[in-house]
Amino acid sequence: SELGAGTRGASMGVDALKIAAIDLKSDYFRKYDEVEISDENWLLLENVKFKYAKRIRGIMKIYERLSKSVGRIMKKQAAYPIVLSGDHSTAGGTIAGIKSAYPEERLGVIWIDAHADLHSPYTTPSGNMHGMPLAAALGEDNLEMKTNELDEKTVELWDKLKNSGGIVPKIEYRDLVYIGVRDTEE
């Protein structure tokens, strides 16, 4: 999916990796089972309904699908899935799935990105959800840095997104490690 990004093209990354593997004569994508999660990219053709949480309804659907799939794989197969996706708004669904498989365990996250991705609809300058997955996983609104006034529906949808998988928070700040961050989005 690329619903969370402000520019297009991220959802083509997985296919680009597969083509590169073929060119390199790698059997990587043949030797492991693949589960494809349907995206909601058709929503890119629709008008944005929530200025500070663009396409949040579609992202919620992806979170739910991804969370269920990751949780099921980890519980039933005792395997660790490798999730290849488009923009990183979907990382929240992966985190929710891992937490659902291990609800009593602390979950650590290593975040490799130029941005901290701790925005919420209350703080986002763009409304793009790819800047919010860690805030959602942390159950964080960041109200002390609030710059946006939200309508009731946006608040309701954001609260539902944070509650994906039924556990809030999914991670704690002390279990979060950043690599490559140059913008902490103060």
Which positions does each model-derived feature cover?
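Conserved alpha-helical scaffold segments that buttress catalytic/binding sites
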Residues: 1-186
